[in-house]
């Protein structure tokens, strides 16, 4: 099957985002901006302890305070929640026990902020403090108190999987090396703070939430379950959103609490979270220890791989089961590896819950693998770019041992592109002392083909409505979180219909108006919603072509649509304008509404015979190669990235402008994890709950990032497209790791490569000299 090729000049064109004007002019309304003059102020009381039993809560003084309208505790939230139906163990407000410092215990709604804060201070909670475990080692130690009764060893999930004969493959290897790497816990640091505006109509028993989410559908499900409401009485709207990066792919406690307060107060509650509270809500990438073992043949071919990954997952399950499976799932699909062994442990700790973050579950193990592969290649005398070329997939299509199907694979071209752009052959190993080059590969899924809450319905649905004015309304439940999905859906629909982009307006992520969608996570929207948009547009085009053919007294197959004109192929007749055809089409039906859907074929949904293969199952992979040029100050230990060349295989760049922006953002987030970002706790307290202490790179630290688009034309993607946002992130870490080694001769095993870590390595090198 070949992808549909664009013909009308809408797809493949650098296109500003359709909502860009509102954003840059300040007209965009984010959740905190929505007018609600009668809204009460919501506030949350949080645990001061990392681990404790709740013996008693007295809210009487808070309830008696003038201006307090509602007070809620865990007694009113008996239903647990969690993003995975098989692991729901978090309560909106803690019941019986708190498991991290910041765990919500009670909440109030009051007439103003001052009153709300006073009310929180009046709530008395009696705790029995318990030992707290900040690391997997401490949590798994014999005698440690279980955070959750059903997991007495504090291990949420163990994974043990083997593909191929690993022992035999290692026995045949000529070079075997093993190394352990650690990766600090990191946070998304999205620009917009968490916020929910909850409006309850007691007459109609209707609850409306405007909230900062990537997946309105999940919020809808969790609010309905925890509040024990009929889901038909709930409406969830995602206004403009200032980023997500995975943090907002779950229904979170503050959203449920806002709904609870609004219902109890019988009114409207605005619950705005501070930057510290937004950090505490967390869902970041967990601290991970990776023990990586690779066997190579003399010619550089990979014989076998064995990895062990241990993650500190935080206090609740969240995405943990999926995250730990992903540590091994994406060892497949990038290189040809005949034998793979994957052992992993996701461990509960008394810290805020971790979750999904850009490159979900794969970044740390990919970085460890790439770093060790580079080091072993050097030991064999093989250039780090060359050793990657040696291990490419042998043919396409390719089915991995994990049952993933690779239908497009632009990695060889990506490597050639960065090789040429960076001057690799001319400059590698020849830069001045203190400066170096490094290279790495990475990849990620174009959406998971096995949704988390799925009853067999299509993976994506898009509706198109055409009325008398000739305007086309595209309705999608997909959440545009800044990545440009509204623009993408408009572009592909306009391309199919042969109309101007300006003719299409998008309504998205409103459960009362738009079809259900599984949301913006795992880079699924372009592939799935894009294909559904094409399906809907083809349906609408069929209606219009039929009307035009009837009007022009021609066969439907002879009708062409060019620049909004419907013409008979080969005829000199000027044809009909779009508006004329709309008028003709509406004669019989009135307003025209059509539906388009997309469903991933079953062969792309994993293999039931392979345990866990639903995780990592996808329609296609985005691939990336990147070269990083960096320098190291040997006095301060500061690592500076000067230039990044990144070639990214996106199948087809539907909007090259957006692809470049998303790729640069992915590289930039990789740089943060590689060089400076780190979550630190002091007796359970997050010590960096602000963007001054949490070291996100600024524009000052950002290098020049040259994006090179590679188009492998995936046969199943919309016009050949795949994801273009996550596949490049992981490669930055091992690429700069190699650049640092070339610059000053030290190889770190702990990330980030912060000045203190680098100076320690330099001091040790000097002492050993």
From Swiss-Prot:
Regulation of activity: Inactivated by low concentrations of cyanide in vitro.
Post-translational modification comment from the UniProt entry: The N-terminus is blocked.
Residues binding Mo-molybdopterin cytosine dinucleotide: 214, 244-245, 522-526, 650-655, 722-725
EC number: 1.1.7.1
UniProt keyword list: Molybdenum, Oxidoreductase
Cofactor remark: Binds 1 Mo-molybdopterin cytosine dinucleotide (Mo-MCD) cofactor per subunit.
Cofactors demanded by this protein: Mo-molybdopterin cytosine dinucleotide
Recorded catalytic activity of this chain's protein: oxidized 2[4Fe-4S]-[ferredoxin] + benzoyl-CoA + H2O = 4-hydroxybenzoyl-CoA + reduced 2[4Fe-4S]-[ferredoxin] + 2 H(+)
Signal peptide: none
Record-level Gene Ontology MF annotations: 4-hydroxybenzoyl-CoA reductase activity; iron ion binding
SMART domains referenced in this protein's UniProt entry, alphabetically: Ald_Xan_dh_C
Family affiliation: Belongs to the xanthine dehydrogenase family.
Classification via NCBIfam families: 4hydrxCoA_A (TIGR03194)
Function, in words: Component of a complex that catalyzes the reductive dehydroxylation of 4-hydroxybenzoyl-CoA to benzoyl-CoA. Reaction is not reversible. Is a key enzyme in the anaerobic degradation of phenolic compounds.
Subunit and partners: Heterohexamer of two alpha, two beta and two gamma subunits.
Protein name: 4-hydroxybenzoyl-CoA reductase subunit alpha
Gene that this polypeptide is encoded by: hcrA
């Amino acid at each position: 099957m070949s992808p549909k090729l664009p013909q009308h000049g809408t797809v493949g064109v650098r296109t500003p985002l359709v909502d860009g004007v509102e954003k840059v002019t300040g007209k965009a309304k984010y959740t905190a901006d929505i007018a609600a003059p009668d809204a009460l102020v919501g506030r949350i009381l949080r645990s001061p302890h990392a681990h404790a039993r709740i013996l008693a809560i007295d809210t009487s003084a808070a309830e008696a305070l003038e201006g307090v309208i509602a007070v809620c505790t865990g007694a009113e939230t008996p239903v647990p929640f969690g993003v995975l139906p098989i692991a729901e163990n978090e309560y909106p407000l803690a019941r019986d026990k708190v498991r991290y410092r910041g765990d919500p215990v009670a909440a109030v709604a009051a007439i103003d902020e001052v009153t709300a804060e006073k009310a929180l201070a009046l709530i008395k909670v009696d705790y029995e403090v318990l030992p707290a475990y900040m690391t997997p080692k401490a949590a798994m130690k014999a005698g440690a108190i279980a955070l959750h009764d059903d997991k007495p060893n504090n291990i949420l999930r163990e994974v043990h999987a083997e593909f191929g004969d690993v022992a035999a493959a290692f026995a045949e290897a000529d070079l075997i090396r093993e190394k352990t790497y650690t990766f600090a816990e990191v946070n998304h640091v999205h620009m917009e703070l968490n916020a929910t505006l909850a409006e309850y109509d007691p007459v109609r028993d209707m609850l409306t939430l405007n909230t900062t989410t990537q997946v309105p559908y999940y919020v809808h499900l969790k609010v309905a379950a925890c509040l024990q409401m009929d889901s038909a009485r709930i409406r969830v709207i995602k206004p403009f959103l200032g980023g997500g990066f995975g943090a907002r792919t779950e229904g979170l406690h503050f959203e449920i609490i806002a709904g609870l307060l609004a219902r109890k107060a019988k009114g409207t509650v605005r619950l705005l979270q501070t930057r510290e509270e937004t950090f505490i809500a967390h869902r970041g990438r967990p601290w991970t220890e990776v023990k990586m073992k690779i066997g190579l043949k003399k010619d550089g071919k990979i014989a076998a791989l064995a990895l062990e990954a241990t993650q500190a997952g935080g206090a609740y399950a969240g995405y943990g089961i999926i995250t730990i499976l992903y540590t091994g799932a994406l060892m497949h699909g990038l290189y040809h590896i005949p034998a793979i062994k994957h052992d992993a442990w996701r461990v509960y700790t008394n810290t805020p819950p971790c979750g999904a973050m850009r490159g979900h579950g794969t970044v740390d193990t990919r970085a460890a693998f790439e770093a060790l592969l580079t080091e072993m290649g050097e030991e064999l005398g093989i250039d780090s770019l060359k050793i990657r070329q040696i291990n490419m997939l042998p043919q396409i299509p390719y089915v991995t041992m994990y049952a993933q199907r690779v239908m497009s694979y632009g990695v060889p071209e990506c490597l050639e592109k960065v090789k040429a752009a960076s001057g690799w052959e001319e400059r590698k190993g020849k830069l001045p002392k203190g400066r170096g080059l490094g290279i790495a590969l990475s990849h990620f899924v174009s959406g998971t083909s096995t949704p988390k809450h799925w009853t067999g319905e299509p993976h994506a649905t898009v509706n198109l409505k055409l009325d008398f004015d000739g305007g086309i309304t595209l309705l999608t439940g997909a959440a545009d979180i800044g990545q440009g999905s509204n623009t993408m859906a408009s572009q592909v629909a306009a391309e199919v219909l042969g109309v101007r982009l300006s003719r299409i307006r998008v309504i998205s992520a409103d459960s009362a108006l738009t079809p259900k969608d599984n949301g913006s996570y795992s880079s699924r929207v372009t592939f799935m919603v894009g294909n559904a948009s094409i399906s809907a547009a083809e349906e609408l085009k069929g209606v219009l072509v039929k009307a035009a053919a009837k009007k022009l007294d021609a066969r439907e197959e002879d009708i062409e649509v060019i620049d909004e004109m419907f013409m008979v192929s080969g005829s000199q007749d000027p044809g009909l304008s779009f508006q004329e055809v709309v008028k003709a089409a509406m004669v019989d039906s009135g307003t025209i509404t059509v539906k388009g859907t997309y469903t991933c074929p079953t062969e792309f949904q994993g293999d039931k015979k392979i345990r866990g293969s639903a995780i990592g199952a996808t329609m296609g992979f985005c691939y990336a190669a990147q070269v990083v040029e960096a320098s190291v100050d040997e006095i301060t230990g500061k690592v500076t990235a000067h230039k990044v060349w990144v070639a990214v295989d996106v199948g087809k760049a539907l909007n090259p402008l957006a692809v470049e922006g998303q790729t640069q953002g992915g590289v930039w987030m990789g740089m943060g994890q590689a060089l400076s970002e780190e979550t630190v706790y002091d007796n359970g307290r997050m010590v960096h709950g602000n963007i001054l202490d949490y070291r996100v790179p600024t524009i000052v630290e950002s290098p020049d990032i040259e994006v090179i688009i590679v188009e492998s034309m995936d046969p199943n993607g919309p016009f050949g497209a795949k994801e273009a946002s996550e596949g490049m992130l992981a490669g930055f870490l091992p690429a700069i790791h190699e650049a640092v080694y070339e610059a000053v001769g030290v190889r770190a095993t702990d990330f980030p490569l912060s000045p203190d870590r680098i100076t320690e390595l330099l001091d040790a090198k000097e002492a050993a000299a």
